[in-house]
Amino acid sequence: MIVLPAIDILDGKPVRLYQGDYGQSKCVAEDVLACAKKFEKEKANYLHVVDLNGAKEGSRINADLICEVVKTCQLPVEVGGGIRTMEAIDFYIENGVSRVILGTSAIQDDCLLKDAIKKYGSKIAVGLDCKDGYVCTSGWLEKSKEYYLDFAKRMEKIGVKTLICTDISKDGTLQGPNFEMLEALKNHVSCNLIASGGVRDLSHIQKCKDLGLYGVIAGKAIYEKTLDLKEALNIC
């Protein structure tokens, strides 16, 4: 299992949100590049980077900074947030991003998703972000009418290989991921599953590993030092 430290970017700064609430953002460091270099030094497997402004606005707001992270670090980087056109997907892949995460566009634009998978295959992942069991869009601000298991099965049928799975109510809480949701997903689809949201400590990392997940994302736990990234990597 891989462990992906998270860098969420809002107005050019690394921040953490609480339950996806932009009004409850907290700056966790002064410099995005310094965060990325620190995670590289600690031998992270992968970086998970989100353009929060982009997710809200539907465009590449922090793209230049993200590209700088990709060029500066020797780690594979996955990027999400506001990627809703093939031009945006092309831009990130051409600038060295290893995996592009589609969220809103995966729900609203089947044609784009299918074309992206045809062109880039496993370099395309989908963010399964849900609240009360239903998938959310537009930076988690809007709830759809699609149940998360139905969405996951639809994504698998289209050819999606990797799902980043977040229960929004768990995000930033340090209360643990929604293991019931993750287990249900594991039982219903064969996609690679990455858990996100709520991770606090090594016990949560171990439980994700025991479930047979492909990966787990940790953000607030690392910044608030309830989880040591090196120790997490060691047990995986």
Walk through the language-model features, giving the residues of each.
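Glycine/small-residue-rich loop that forms an oxyanion/phosphate-binding "nest" at active or ligand-binding sites
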Residues: 53, 61-118
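Conserved anion-binding
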Residues: 12-15, 19-23, 90, 97-171
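Catalytic cores of alpha/beta
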Residues: 73, 77-96, 180-182, 186-215
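Charged helix-capping and loop-helix junction motifs
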Residues: 60-67, 141-150, 175-184
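C-terminal helical cap(s) of enzyme catalytic domains, especially alpha/beta-barrels
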Residues: 112-119, 209, 213-218, 222-236
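Conserved, mostly hydrophobic/aromatic
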Residues: 8, 39, 47, 92, ...
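Glycine-rich, proline-tolerant flexible connector loops at the mouths of alpha/beta enzymes
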Residues: 46-62, 104, 164-175
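Conserved beta-strand positions in the central sheet of alpha/beta enzyme cores
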Residues: 48-51, 78, 101-102, 125, ...
